[in-house]
Amino acid sequence: MIDLSTLTTERRNDETFNLDQMTVKEALVKMNNEDKKVAYAVEEALPNIEPVISSAIEAFNKGGRLIYMGAGTSGRLGVLDAAECVPTFGVPATQVVGLIAGGDKAMTVAVEGAEDSLELGRQDLIDLNLSENDLVLGIAASGRTPYVIGALDYAKEIGAKRASLSCNLNAEISKHAEFPIEVDCGPEFLTGSTRLKSGTAQKLILNMISTISMIGIGKVYNNLMVDVKPTNEKLVERSKRIIMQATDCTYEEAEEKFNEANQDVKLAIVMLLTDCAAEEGKTKLVKANGFVKNTLN
């Protein structure tokens, strides 16, 4: 039998013993107070998050991938963060990948036993053709999910970089990673429900890892997402606004260059900032490794 009694995420919260007797307002205040603790817990982990981001940047520069792996809520959060990288940063869906124990079906329904399989974690990475240039980030609130451990151990065999994210201290998965992240948010508002504070902490950290690593490979100019993909009307208008903000041009100028650049926001910005045509702008960006700032030198 697995002993979960020592895990912080499984302990009862002294502040919510009488949860079923609270009014809606009382429960809301309690839950909000618990949630306030999460950002401070994440702050404590910043020194351990930094090397994971550096490793992700290194992986991207080598043509490698960032691969999130988890089960249940942890897996879903990884899939969500990976999916958002495509429209936000204009990267291919293969560059940041989210894998969940049990496959796509597990995004909406529980797949019994999937998280308990070491072999399944290994096999999912084999199917993905894991390489030594990749970074695997195993996510498990409990810090002991076999699916994640199996994946991390296979990554070690291949020579890929390994990171882990747990919401318990001294987590088992930390022993299987080069770059372990452990966040102690305290017991959950609802005992054992790690979709709450643990899930919030994981989301905050995944936001940090994906966003700051993308900054590190030139996907941002100032604080603007210049590689955004205008896949709908809202994003088309946002793209023009980004061009205006980056170059201090008019709406009409932004629209003109946006169209000349074939709706490539970053290229339109370089064309305006360096007063060049589209082809020359492309050449400048290639020489600058995709960093807008470096085209201005």
From Swiss-Prot:
Keyword Lyase: yes
Residue ranges of the TM segments: none
GO MF terms held by the record: carbohydrate derivative binding; carbon-oxygen lyase activity; ether hydrolase activity
Pathway(s) the chain acts in: Amino-sugar metabolism; N-acetylmuramate degradation
Single biological process term from Gene Ontology: amino sugar catabolic process
Active-site residue numbers: 84, 115
Domain called SIS: residue spans: 56-219
UniProt cross-references to Gene3D superfamilies, sorted A to Z: 1.10.8.1080, Glucose-6-phosphate isomerase like protein, domain 1
UniProt cross-references to InterPro entries, sorted A to Z: Etherase_MurQ (IPR005488), Glucokinase_regulatory_CS (IPR005486), MURQ/GCKR (IPR040190), SIS_dom (IPR001347), SIS_dom_sf (IPR046348)
EC number(s) on file: 4.2.1.126
Keyword Lyase: yes
Keyword annotations from UniProtKB, A to Z: Carbohydrate metabolism, Lyase
Reactions catalysed according to its record: N-acetyl-D-muramate 6-phosphate + H2O = N-acetyl-D-glucosamine 6-phosphate + (R)-lactate
Function: Specifically catalyzes the cleavage of the D-lactyl ether substituent of MurNAc 6-phosphate, producing GlcNAc 6-phosphate and D-lactate.
Other observations noted: A lyase-type mechanism (elimination/hydration) is suggested for the cleavage of the lactyl ether bond of MurNAc 6-phosphate, with the formation of an alpha,beta-unsaturated aldehyde intermediate with (E)-stereochemistry, followed by the syn addition of water to give product.
Family: Belongs to the GCKR-like family. MurNAc-6-P etherase subfamily.
Self-association and partners: Homodimer.
Protein name according to UniProt: N-acetylmuramic acid 6-phosphate etherase
Organism for this UniProt entry: Lactococcus lactis subsp. cremoris (strain MG1363)
Lineage of the organism: Bacteria, Bacillati, Bacillota, Bacilli, Lactobacillales
This protein's encoding gene: murQ
